């Protein structure tokens, strides 16, 4: 069982701890985090060097293009353009990530689509909401009345987040074609064929006046998939390259990797959960401090300790790591009970709080390297691992991960180093998935989820049945009509 991809809060993770200078991790200078290990290394991320990630003139432009190097610009003729909002809340339950984007092109069309991020915000959950969501992770406490009430309350919070980011982008709700809301996962049971995300889409549609697509995962489960991961579909659209094999590693509550082979088609892309991400790191910080810390911000606690090889050796024996792909995991496996066992064993070994934090941080990095050895290296020799999610702001974790992957000949970079956004990446993905849903285009990757066939994802709710659908707007555009706003 798994709690799928997480949209992590990163602001508090912009590290105060000092990383080992011997291990370089790429992060853009403007981000204020990791910088490259010399000019030769940095040259791989100069403007224009990531096809599809930068415009033809070298300036950062569209975040991705369906065809490598084919960034769509304002001057290249009339294209179908629209605005969408993506909402994401992940397994760390920190809050709501909201992204407003511009999408250009036709979903499923020969020309593909590209996406430009207009605005991003994170709206932290109120303390009582976060506390109750954690209680709902326990099936015995997730009674129908409690789940129903939180479903509506989250719908209101998501709607408010959507309206806020729309305003930040300089748009009005009337400009936006669709809101894509992942919702908050409270239970995910792929072996039983079901998943539960809450945050009512009908409430979002009613409060914003914008069509809303939500409940993305059940359609994949219904055709035999895991219902996760879903983000690899959008990663394929936005990141693939003709000559380099990329690994897109997200480190949210759970870690997950997408393998994008050089020159691949959608059938070649696969993805899976690598194991715990920030879940154990933050869990240890909270447990050993009696809740005084909600997370190990900046890896500060782990930086004061040393990883214990005895405990690491025991933790590496968990059966999940050897399970075949596709696979997914989550709090049901690496949650509170597992965490308490780790802390008890650590105390038996005489470990300090900092040593415990350092050990589970090293475990997360090891699990990513181990997954590469078991499930990727024999098929593809990766050139670059691009890391996103809240874990990318933990310098101790990134130091450990860079060391793991350097031993395997793989360079590690952050989303910011290649022109992306660690914070916004998954919210962007659900905006694009909603756009595909409105066009009734499949948006899962069977090779990633294990589904028997492609499926149209999500359920749509709308307050305005007269609002033009994507296909109708494209038909009008082809007949000479244009709703493209003047810039």
What spans do the regions from the language model cover?
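Conserved ATP-utilizing enzyme core subdomain
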Residues: 95-125, 264-365, 369, 453-486
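Gly/Thr-rich phosphate-binding beta-strand-loop-beta motif of the actin/hexokinase/Hsp70
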Residues: 80-116, 247-262
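Phosphate-binding/catalytic loop of phosphoryl-transfer enzymes
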Residues: 81-83, 190-195, 202, 210-293, ...
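Glycine-rich nucleotide/cofactor/substrate-binding loop typically near the N-terminus or early
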Residues: 102-165
């Amino acid at each position: 069982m798994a709690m799928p991809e997480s949209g992590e809060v990163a602001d508090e993770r912009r590290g105060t701890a000092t990383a080992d200078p011997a291990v370089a991790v790429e992060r853009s200078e403007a981000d204020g985090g990791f910088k490259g290990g010399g000019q030769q290394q940095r040259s791989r991320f100069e403007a224009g060097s990531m096809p599809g990630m930068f415009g033809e003139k070298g300036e950062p432009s569209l975040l991705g293009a369906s065809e490598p190097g084919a960034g769509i610009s304002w001057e290249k003729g009339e294209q179908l353009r629209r605005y969408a909002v993506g909402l994401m809340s992940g397994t760390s339950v920190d809050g709501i990530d909201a992204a407003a984007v511009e999408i250009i092109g036709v979903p499923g069309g020969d020309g593909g689509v590209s996406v430009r991020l207009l605005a991003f915000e994170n709206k932290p959950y109120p303390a009582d909401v976060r506390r109750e969501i954690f209680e709902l992770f326990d099936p015995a406490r997730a009674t129908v009345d409690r789940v129903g009430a939180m479903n509506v309350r989250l719908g209101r919070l998501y709607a408010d987040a959507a309206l806020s980011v729309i305003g930040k982008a300089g748009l009005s709700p009337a400009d936006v074609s669709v809101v894509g809301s992942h919702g908050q996962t409270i239970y995910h049971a792929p072996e039983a064929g079901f998943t539960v995300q809450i945050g009512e889409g009908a409430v979002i549609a009613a409060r914003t006046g914008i069509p809303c697509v939500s409940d993305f995962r059940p359609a994949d489960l219904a055709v035999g998939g895991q219902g996760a991961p879903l983000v690899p579909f959008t990663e394929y659209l936005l990141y693939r390259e003709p000559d380099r094999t990329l690994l897109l590693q997200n480190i949210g509550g759970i870690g997950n990797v997408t393998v994008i082979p050089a020159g691949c088609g959608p059938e070649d892309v696969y993805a899976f959960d690598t194991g715990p991400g920030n879940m154990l790191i933050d869990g240890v910080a909270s447990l050993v401090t009696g809740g005084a810390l909600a997370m190990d911000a900046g890896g500060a606690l782990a930086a004061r300790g040393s990883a214990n090889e005895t405990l690491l050796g025991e933790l590496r024996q968990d059966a999940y790591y050897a399970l075949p792909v596709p696979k997914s995991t989550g709090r049901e496996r690496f949650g509170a009970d597992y965490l308490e066992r780790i802390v008890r064993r650590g105390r038996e070994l005489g470990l300090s709080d900092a040593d415990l934090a350092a050990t589970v941080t090293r475990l997360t990095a090891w699990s990513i390297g181990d997954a590469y050895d078991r499930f990727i290296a024999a098929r593809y020799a990766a050139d670059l691992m691009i890391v996103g999610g809240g874990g990318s702001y933990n310098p101790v974790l990134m130091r450990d991960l860079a060391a793991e992957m350097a031993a395997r000949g793989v360079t590690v970079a952050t989303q910011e180093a290649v022109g992306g956004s660690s914070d916004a990446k998954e919210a962007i993905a659900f905006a694009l998935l909603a756009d595909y849903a409105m066009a009734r285009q499949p948006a899962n990757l069977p090779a990633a989820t294990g589904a028997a066939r492609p499926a149209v994802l999500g359920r749509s709710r709308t307050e305005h049945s007269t609002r033009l659908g994507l296909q109708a707007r494209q038909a009008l555009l082809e007949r000479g009509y244009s709703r493209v706003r003047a810039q």
